């Protein structure tokens, strides 16, 4: 996946810069999300792989996407097809969404707890995390009984393990050393 990310980065960056310039970030995000799903669809990929030229690949892809792609989106598809990079479209969509979140000063935070968090706990957690990261926080909560108690918080490259399971593991490691 890292190779696809490397391939996708210049396309995503160019699309994002154009979207910022034109004030069409949200429509580009939706367009790339849709195109990424089409590119990752097995049947569509097989059909596109059977096309003899990049031009016919691009034309077919644009037909499949129909009205979902504006003129700039169609141009992106044509350039990517000419360079044999349509397979990287899902990664382009992911990177674009990441650039959008950074631009909007938003961060996705995954929270794992032993039991479901009530609304008041979620609000308190969001307030504390927004203060810590200086960004708007989008909370994604999940439960895992293995956590035992406490929380595991994952935000980008940051992991905060405040779970009882994590504390027990650290204690066991300390005792073994």
From Swiss-Prot:
Question: Which gene is transcribed and translated to give this protein?
Answer: atpH
Q: What GO molecular function annotations does the UniProt record carry, in alphabetical order?
A: proton-transporting ATP synthase activity, rotational mechanism
What membrane topology is annotated for this entry? Peripheral membrane protein
Q: How does it assemble?
A: F-type ATPases have 2 components, F(1) - the catalytic core - and F(0) - the membrane proton channel. F(1) has five subunits: alpha(3), beta(3), gamma(1), delta(1), epsilon(1). F(0) has three main subunits: a(1), b(2) and c(10-14). The alpha and beta chains form an alternating ring which encloses part of the gamma chain. F(1) is attached to F(0) by a central stalk formed by the gamma and epsilon chains, while a peripheral stalk is formed by the delta and b chains.
PANTHER family found in the cross-reference section: ATP SYNTHASE DELTA CHAIN (PTHR11910)
Q: What protein name is recorded for this chain? A: ATP synthase subunit delta
- Main site of residence? membrane
Q: Where in the cell is it found?
A: Cell inner membrane
**Keywords on record:** ATP synthesis, Cell inner membrane, Cell membrane, CF(1), Hydrogen ion transport, Ion transport, Membrane, Transport
Query: InterPro entries, alphabetically?
Result: ATP_synth_OSCP/delta_N_sf, ATPase_OSCP/dsu
Q: Which family does it belong to?
A: Belongs to the ATPase delta chain family.
Q: Which Pfam families is this protein grouped with? A: OSCP
């Amino acid at each position: 996946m890292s190779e696809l990310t490397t391939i996708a980065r210049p396309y995503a960056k160019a699309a994002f810069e154009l979207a910022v310039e034109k004030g069409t970030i949200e429509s580009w995000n939706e367009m790339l999300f849709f195109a990424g799903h089409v590119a990752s669809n097995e049947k569509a990929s097989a059909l596109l792989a059977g096309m003899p030229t990049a031009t016919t690949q691009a034309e077919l892809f644009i037909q499949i996407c129909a009205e979902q792609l504006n003129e700039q989106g169609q141009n992106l598809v044509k350039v990517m097809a000419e360079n044999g990079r349509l397979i990287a479209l899902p990664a382009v969509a992911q990177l674009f969404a990441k650039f959008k979140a950074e631009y909007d000063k938003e961060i996705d935070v995954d929270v794992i707890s032993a039991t479901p968090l009530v609304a008041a706990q979620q609000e308190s957690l969001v307030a504390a995390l927004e203060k810590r990261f200086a960004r708007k926080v989008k909370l994604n909560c999940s439960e895992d009984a293995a956590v035992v108690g406490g929380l595991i918080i994952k935000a980008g490259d940051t992991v905060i393990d405040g779970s009882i399971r994590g504390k027990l593991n650290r204690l066991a490691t300390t005792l073994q050393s």
